[in-house]
Amino acid sequence: MTNIREDENIFMFLCEKWILINKNHIWNRINQRINIIADFDRYQRARTISEGQRTENIHRNIYGAVPYDYNLVNLTSTQRNPLGYINASVAEFPEIGRHYIITGAAQDTQIPFFWQMVFEQKSPAIVMLLEDVELGIEKSDKYFPNNTREELKFGIYDITCKEFVKRNILEYRLLEVSVGNETHQVHHYKFHGWTEFNLPKYEDFMAFYNTMKEVGVPLLAVMKNNCMSSFFKKYHHTPPTNAPIIQCSTGGARCGVFIIIDILINLIDNRIKNSYSIEWWMLKVRSKRNHSALTNQQHSFIYDIIIKYIRTRHNQLRHLEKYLEAHANTVRMIDSTNTEDVDKFIKPRDWIVDFDERDRLIGKLQFRKRLKIEKDQVSEQKLVHLKSQLHLFQDTYKYESYVLQ
């Protein structure tokens, strides 16, 4: 059974933060600050992008998106790709034991290298967050068989489809990659209805996300320590990460949105202590993948998904939203030109809400609501007693929990 108190705290924090951002109309300003902080961090840590800018590699990039050098996926050198370059980044989050490979759409001549990456990295899953064609623009070339009757070959890699399931917005395939006598199976999930120009509905996104859990292996493999295997075997490529591959048109914003949502849901499900600051995780993802800035709408979408996810787990929490709105109205307006004010929405330790003060106000509003309900049901003497309690409560009383009140 889930711990409702822990979920309740996360729900209250994110819901009121979302209310305050909307109230102050500062989505754009927050994202501007995130971009500035991310760029400063990039230059301070000297995160270069020279490998992707080399003459031999630049044609392998998608829409000009060039990845960082420090976390590139390196392939075994081949005659066609002597530098072993692929536009893909290993995004590791050791503090929570999670990792991903982020990459862009499969482009014709680069498809053999994509499957080389899948095979060498032993990736358990591919999450495809793009359509082949979006608003008349071709985004991805065909790189996998459509059904169990079809087989494809890219270079030395034979790709067969062992299972195929289609459910509204989801296509699932169990694919097998073969090189000689060696094989590797990978779960392929394709999401329909999420393009560069729109956002999916909560119901569609969660149907896709939950189906991934039901159909195959868990999307996320816990990070494995490759130090020992690397010690005993000299790899000519990045040692196998066993990381799932997250794929959108450029390996940018949609991948970032999906990863942040996936991380937060896993933190919630496993009751892991965390700041649960969406903006902090946006910065973390930006540090792993260049060109992964989110739009205001994508930023807000993450809030919408996580708030609704918690509310779905505990439907009674919906009653808190009106109280959180009431408290948000007592919080001073934010000066969007004041960098220090805006940064309070980004840095977890600088949050502007006094939780104790918020709890007292919500408790008082709930007490008054109960008092109003009881007015017609109690004697005059009881009403006097209840009112005296209310007077005392205004200075001293605080609810320990707001659910079921």
UniProtKB/Swiss-Prot annotation:
Matches recorded under PROSITE patterns: TYR_PHOSPHATASE_2 (PS50056), TYR_PHOSPHATASE_PTP (PS50055)
GO cellular component terms given for this protein: cytoplasm; plasma membrane
Entry's EC annotation: 3.1.3.48
GO molecular function, one term: phosphoprotein phosphatase activity
Membrane topology: Peripheral membrane protein
Chief localisation class: cytoplasm
Disruption phenotype: Moderate increase in constitutive dauer larva formation at 27 degrees Celsius. Increases constitutive dauer larva formation at 25 degrees Celsius in akt-1 mg306, age-1 hx546 or pdk-1 sa709 mutant backgrounds. Normal lifespan.
Keywords associated with the record: Cell membrane, Cytoplasm, Hydrolase, Membrane, Protein phosphatase
Span of domain Tyrosine-protein phosphatase: 30-309
Cellular localisation: Cytoplasm; Cell membrane
Gene Ontology biological process terms from the UniProt entry: dauer larval development; signal transduction
Active site: C248 (phosphocysteine intermediate)
Homology family: Belongs to the protein-tyrosine phosphatase family.
Protein name (database record): Tyrosine-protein phosphatase non-receptor type eak-6
Species: Caenorhabditis elegans
Organism lineage string: Eukaryota, Metazoa, Ecdysozoa, Nematoda, Chromadorea
